[in-house]
Regions:
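ATP-hydrolysis module of ASCE/P-loop NTPase motor domains
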Residues: 33-36, 55-144, 167
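Short helix-loop boundary/capping segments at the starts of domains
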Residues: 6, 19, 23, 55, ...
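P-loop NTPase Walker
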Residues: 1-61, 65, 137, 161, ...
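Secondary-structure boundary motif
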Residues: 19-26, 81-84, 136, 155, ...
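Generic alpha-helical structural context detector
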Residues: 44-47, 51, 96-99, 147, ...
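Conserved helicase NTPase motor core
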Residues: 1-2, 9-10, 38, 67, ...
Length: 201
């Protein structure tokens, strides 16, 4: 398994690996993906794993994935619904705060406990509406893909063991850019029996 941050980086890495394996006659040019290592972004890896285990988790096999613009659109509507001035309560900044909190495993319920200012109360109100809209659309955002995958691995020992055995060697690109959720994701995927992991960055 190789994990990186962008689809472009994953594509370039995949092409390089396939080219090298073909040169070494390890894989056939006619069927290059048959024995190729799995190379994905963190988010696409999370989505793949959640989809594979959807029956166990009671999830849709192919949930709607909201990109950044979709998320921002919902947050703009939430700001409007609450009668807030978007010039004072910038939807882009609110989205960034929600994303950061999710990446640190803070849920909307957890954030409510942290509220210590009027601005945080506003963020919580927007976040609550945002999560309700996601639930209604049966959708997840990018942050949910990794956070939910981490919770799955933490809560289900058999699923964690399956992926630890499946990914015997793990390579992480641009490791210095990982956030708390991505670090936890990596840690849970590494098999403690041999700790075969290489990080770059």
């Amino acid at each position: 398994l190789a994990a990186t941050f962008t689809s472009e980086a994953a594509k370039e890495t995949r092409e390089l690996v396939i080219g090298r394996l073909e040169d070494e006659h390890i894989i056939e040019k006619e069927n290059p993906y048959h024995h190729t290592p799995l190379i994905k972004t963190f988010h696409s890896l999370g989505l793949m794993m959640l989809s594979e285990q959807s029956d166990r988790l009671g999830l849709l096999n192919h949930p709607t994935i909201l990109d950044s613009s979709d998320s921002l659109s919902i947050i703009k509507k939430a700001v409007e619904q609450l009668g807030l001035d978007p010039k004072i309560n910038d939807p882009s900044k609110i989205r960034s705060i929600i994303s950061r909190e999710k990446s640190d495993f803070v849920s909307v319920t957890d954030y409510k406990v942290k509220v210590a200012s009027a601005q945080m109360e506003i963020i919580h109100s927007v976040w609550r509406i945002y999560q309700e809209e996601l639930k209604m659309q049966k959708a997840v955002d990018f942050d949910d893909l990794i956070v939910r995958a981490v919770h799955m691995l933490e809560d289900h020992e058999d699923i964690r063991g399956y992926y630890q055995n499946r990914f015997k060697y793990i390579h992480i690109d641009e490791y210095q850019d990982t956030n708390g959720a991505q670090y936890a994701f990596i840690k849970l995927l590494v098999n403690p029996a041999h700790n075969n992991i290489c990080v770059v960055g």
